[in-house]
From Swiss-Prot:
This is Photosystem I reaction center subunit XI. SUPFAM superfamilies: Photosystem I reaction center subunit XI, PsaL. The chain crosses the membrane at residues 73-93, 124-144. Residues 94-123 are lumenal.
Length: 152
């Protein structure tokens, strides 16, 4: 048992954060396929994809847990609440880009002012699109359920 658990590089004062979970090929593949880490994506497409998921998942909590959840306008209020939060978050992303990146930096990388502006623009468009898509799905859920029963 003493050979199994031993200090990293035989030095008890050096730590290592590698675990069987973090070093597995499954975890590495899963993380490398996320849009934040995927190689070859432009900042605009990266922001668009990340924004779509955020917009899509923001509608549900506002719709089901918002103060108007038991009224007829719950879905509309949930969508407008999600859109309001999306605009606030896009403003925060823009402010972060202004204070974090030098305007002299060039290139299409995400760590430049131009790249961050593209990311923010893509995120805003994607999140509004994701919230709109969630609204369309929830508003037509009864139609979708009757359509699926016809296929059986």
């Amino acid at each position: 048992m003493t050979q199994f658990v031993k200090p990293y590089n035989d030095d008890p004062f050096v730590g290592n954060l590698a675990t069987p979970i973090t070093t597995s090929s499954f975890t590495r593949t899963l993380l490398s396929n996320l849009p934040a880490y995927r190689a070859g994506l432009s900042p605009l497409l990266r922001g668009l994809e990340i924004g779509m998921t955020h917009g899509y998942f923001l509608v549900g909590p506002f719709y089901k847990l918002g103060p108007l959840r038991n009224s007829e306008v719950a879905l509309l209020a949930g969508v407008f609440s999600a859109l309001g939060l999306i605009i606030i978050m896009a403003a925060c992303l823009a402010i972060y880009g202004v204070v974090s990146f030098n305007t002299n930096d060039g290139g299409e990388q995400l760590q430049s002012a131009k790249g961050w502006r593209q990311f923010t623009s893509g995120w805003l468009v994607g999140s509004i699109g994701g919230a709109s898509f969630a609204y369309i799905l929830i508003a037509n859920v009864s139609f979708l359920q009757t359509g699926s029963s016809l296929l059986k």
